[in-house]
């Protein structure tokens, strides 16, 4: 398949899954002016009615097969729950559609590796929602590192704790917190280090006696000697009257530090 897109031509896309994340993508695509949102698919009737109301130019469907069979559709956005992602990615490859996928790319590690193998052996372009690499604050911090302002990079510490979804609140197919949200930080730490992971140790807490850990702390090293420390969980005071967050990045070098705090409204470097 020809993967070249003209800047003057809108990219024709079908959105599959129009829940919270699907609507975020729809909004971003509308704002960019680069996309023709030809289809919106969702199995929920109420959600389909909402799609018809706010995106009247799109054909709203219940079954995604029509999107895959439309040869004019170049890209599919896969924003349903993780248990359906493998099947949809298989169909996208079979029908020659480029892929924008929400994370995680499947609901188990075995299926995720199957997705990786399929994509690597296909001729479609694919991307996963690991957006932190595009954020202004991470790019600014990396610029400080590249300019040598903190000396040689030595230690990367990331903490992200929120009163997010507790077990049973709609997060089951995405897996425990570290398997879903935590992958942002696994990815961004590697991006900073510019190296592959060498060693790691982790511990988790099965909050509320749930079967999976909802809080994980992982630390280790990269092949180039940089040390990392990631703390992530959805356990930060769900029942509090006034909810808060604890989100920060500390990057420590031989001659200085650069750090960022984020309260989900404002990031400060």
Where do the PLM segments sit?
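N-terminal Rossmann-like dinucleotide-binding module
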Residues: 1-55
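A contiguous active-site-proximal alpha/beta segment in oxidoreductase catalytic domains
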Residues: 83, 106-167
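Hydrophobic residues in well-ordered beta-strands that form the structural core
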Residues: 101, 126-128, 157, 230, ...
């Amino acid at each position: 398949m020809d993967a070249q897109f003209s800047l003057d031509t809108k990219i024709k896309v079908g959105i599959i899954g129009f829940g919270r994340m699907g609507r975020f993508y729809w909004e971003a695509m509308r704002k960019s002016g680069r996309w023709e949102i030809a289809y919106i698919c969702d199995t929920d009737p109420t959600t389909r009615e909402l799609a018809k109301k706010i995106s009247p130019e799109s054909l709203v469907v219940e079954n995604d097969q029509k999107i895959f069979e439309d040869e004019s559709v170049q890209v599919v956005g896969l924003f349903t729950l993780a248990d359906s992602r493998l099947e949809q990615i298989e169909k996208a490859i079979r029908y020659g559609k480029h892929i924008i996928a929400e994370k995680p790319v499947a609901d188990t590690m075995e299926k995720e590796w199957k997705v990786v193998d399929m994509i690597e052996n296909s001729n479609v372009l694919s991307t996963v929602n690991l957006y932190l690499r595009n954020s202004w604050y991470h790019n600014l911090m990396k610029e400080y590192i590249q300019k040598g302002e903190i000396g040689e990079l030595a230690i990367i510490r990331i903490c992200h704790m929120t009163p997010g979804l507790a077990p049973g609140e709609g997060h089951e197919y995405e897996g425990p917190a570290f398997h879903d949200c935590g992958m942002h930080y696994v990815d961004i730490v590697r991006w900073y280090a510019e190296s592959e992971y060498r060693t790691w140790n982790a511990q988790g807490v099965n909050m509320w006696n749930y079967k999976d850990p909802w809080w994980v702390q992982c630390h280790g090293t990269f092949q180039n000697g940089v040390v990392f420390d990631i703390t992530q969980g959805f356990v930060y005071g769900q029942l509090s009257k006034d909810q808060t967050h604890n989100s920060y990045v500390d990057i420590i070098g031989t001659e200085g530090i650069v750090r960022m705090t984020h309260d989900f409204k404002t990031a400060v470097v």
